[in-house]
């Protein structure tokens, strides 16, 4: 089970309301919570807009009360994965739109109660780079996890529309993912464990947030059999069953960045013909410093198990894929398409030995990140155009 200790600094949290009717001191308690919230906001390095948005979210959340199955009206399905279905719902008592993840588990009541208890840690995970949490409950054989609704969906969904995501956009994504991982590690001593495009959510305000991180060891254990797809983003050390740390999340981020850059899951690597089809021009062997001829063993016959590219080979079996991740050279970005800074950044994430792989601190000070932090990028505008969303009347140029 994932070990958790008390955060070094007080976690940013506001106590969820309990549906027992108003008490004489509820107004005073609410004001005390708000003062406490403002103090904790000051501890995080946020700009004014981020502070206002977090404060608004937590103030709304305090009015939600106890979550019950009968209080939700289903609007539409948002997606499925990790053993659950995510739907867009309206919480009738508050009028709030939420994303509700339903996970069906055949488990004993004691295990179920432990999962719900462990998920309560999410109430304390409040950051501009972490999807907001309203609460979790059990009903009719299913655990419900209610979260902030992100109208841009996940980056794997965005990729289907965009085909490829531009480097300057991925610069902003990289900043948000690194800051989200650093927040989870520094404030809560937890690692994500499941970084991949479908767990990076975006919205029309230009915000980029992580979801589905491993706060509940019992839930992870109970869902172990449904993690086959997720294993394709796991680091070599994790696939081999050895000790792993937040360095494993960095591998997963690097692999995700290559996928979002070329438009398909990058293992096995695309050959020159496929790269030419992807980028619309001839490529010389495609991958910098890693010609296919020096691969230690012949390239497996299968194509990626999923993706949006033009590879027509039969799908790669999962055991072939996992063997490839452990024993073959890591993926790289194609030469001549991306900046050297971005290529180096990804290469540092995808070093197979975790002791040599870059850590969060090194990556945050990398030239690619420093450049992306000062670059003016209209992330919200790009996303809204790509997904044909209505842009809010007061969008930000970047939310990171």
UniProtKB/Swiss-Prot annotation:
Instruction: Return one GO MF term.
Output: MAP kinase kinase activity
Q: Which reaction does it catalyse?
A: L-seryl-[protein] + ATP = O-phospho-L-seryl-[protein] + ADP + H(+); L-threonyl-[protein] + ATP = O-phospho-L-threonyl-[protein] + ADP + H(+); L-tyrosyl-[protein] + ATP = O-phospho-L-tyrosyl-[protein] + ADP + H(+)
Write down the position(s) of the site called Cleavage: 10-11
Could you list this entry's UniProt keywords, alphabetically sorted. Acetylation, ATP-binding, Cytoplasm, Kinase, Magnesium, Membrane, Metal-binding, Nucleotide-binding, Phosphoprotein, Serine/threonine-protein kinase, Transferase, Tyrosine-protein kinase
Q: Disulfide bonds, which pairs?
A: none
Modification N-acetylmethionine, positions: 1
Q: What is this protein called?
A: Dual specificity mitogen-activated protein kinase kinase 2
Give the organism, scientific name. Canis lupus familiaris
């Amino acid at each position: 089970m994932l070990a958790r200790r008390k955060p070094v600094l007080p976690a940013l949290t506001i106590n969820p309301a309990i549906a027992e009717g108003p008490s004489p001191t509820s107004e005073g308690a609410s004001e005390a919570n708000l003062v406490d919230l403002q103090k904790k906001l000051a501890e995080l390095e946020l700009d004014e807009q981020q502070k206002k948005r977090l404060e608004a979210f937590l103030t709304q959340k305090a009015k939600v009360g106890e979550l019950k199955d009968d209080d939700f009206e289903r609007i539409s399905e948002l997606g499925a994965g990790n053993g659950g279905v995510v739907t867009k719902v309206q919480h009738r008592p508050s009028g709030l739109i939420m994303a509700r993840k339903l996970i069906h588990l055949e488990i004993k009541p004691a295990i179920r109660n432990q999962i719900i208890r462990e998920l309560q840690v999410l109430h304390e995970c409040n950051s501009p780079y972490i999807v907001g949490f309203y609460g979790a409950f059990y009903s009719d054989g299913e655990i419900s996890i209610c979260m902030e609704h992100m109208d841009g969906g996940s980056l794997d969904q965005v990729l289907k529309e965009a085909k490829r995501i531009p480097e300057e956009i991925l610069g902003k994504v990289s900043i948000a993912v690194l800051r989200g991982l650093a927040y989870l590690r520094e404030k809560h001593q937890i690692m994500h464990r499941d970084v991949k495009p479908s767990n990076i959510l975006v919205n029309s305000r230009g915000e980029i947030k992580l979801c589905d991180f491993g706060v509940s060891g019992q839930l992870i254990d109970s869902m172990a059999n449904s993690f086959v797809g997720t294993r394709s983003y796991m680091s070599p050390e994790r696939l081999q069953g050895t000790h792993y740390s937040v360095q494993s999340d960095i591998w997963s981020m690097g692999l995700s960045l290559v996928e979002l850059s070329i438009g398909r899951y990058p293992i096995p690597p695309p050959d020159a013909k496929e790269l030419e089809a992807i980028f619309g021009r001839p490529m010389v062997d495609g991958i910098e410093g890693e010609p296919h001829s020096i691969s230690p063993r012949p390239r497996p016959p299968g194509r990626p198990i999923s993706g949006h590219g033009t590879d027509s080979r039969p799908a790669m079996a999962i055991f072939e894929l996992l063997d490839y991740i452990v024993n073959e050279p890591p993926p790289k970005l194609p030469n001549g398409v991306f900046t050297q800074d971005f290529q180096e950044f990804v290469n540092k994430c995808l070093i197979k030995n975790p002791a040599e792989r870059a850590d969060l601190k090194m990556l945050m000070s990398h030239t690619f990140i420093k450049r992306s932090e000062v670059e003016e990028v209209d992330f919200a505008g790009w996303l809204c155009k790509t997904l044909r969303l209505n842009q809010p009347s007061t969008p930000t140029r970047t939310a990171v």
